[in-house]
Design a protein with these regions (language model features):
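Acidic, surface-exposed loops and disordered segments
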Residues: 1-118
Length: 118
């Protein structure tokens, strides 16, 4: 059932707007798998790239993105991870979700100071 079909499923206060809806749970069917990009298509990976970075990239590739576009990129710069949104619809919002998945997969925090809450 869609959130739009359920009366009072959500509340939007004055001055707020609904940016996106992320569904959680299990569907009636398993759906269909979508093609995913390869880690090398979204990150700079070399022979000496640490395993935690590769794990983070692989987790980021599992993150939900608008229209399954996976429009983002990661790069390791010394001890810092750089993440960039690509072009596409909602790619800036997708980047926040992707960064979270990267941190879960890598087991390390990199983007905590970048997160801002209104």
């Amino acid at each position: 059932m869609s959130y739009a079909k359920v009366k009072n499923a959500y509340t939007i206060a004055k001055g707020e707007k609904l940016c996106c809806v992320i569904s959680l749970g299990y569907g009636k069917t398993h759906g269909t798998p979508h093609k995913s990009k390869l880690p090398e298509e979204v990150a700079v990976i070399k022979d000496d790239t640490p395993e935690w970075f590769i794990n983070g990239v692989n987790a980021a590739l599992l993150a939900p993105t608008a229209m399954n576009q996976q429009s983002f990129g990661f790069m390791l710069d010394g001890d810092k991870v750089l993440a960039k949104a690509g072009k596409g619809i909602l790619s800036d919002m997708d980047l926040g979700i992707v960064k979270y998945h990267f941190e879960i997969g890598s087991g390390k925090e990199f983007f905590k100071d970048e997160m801002k809450f209104a």
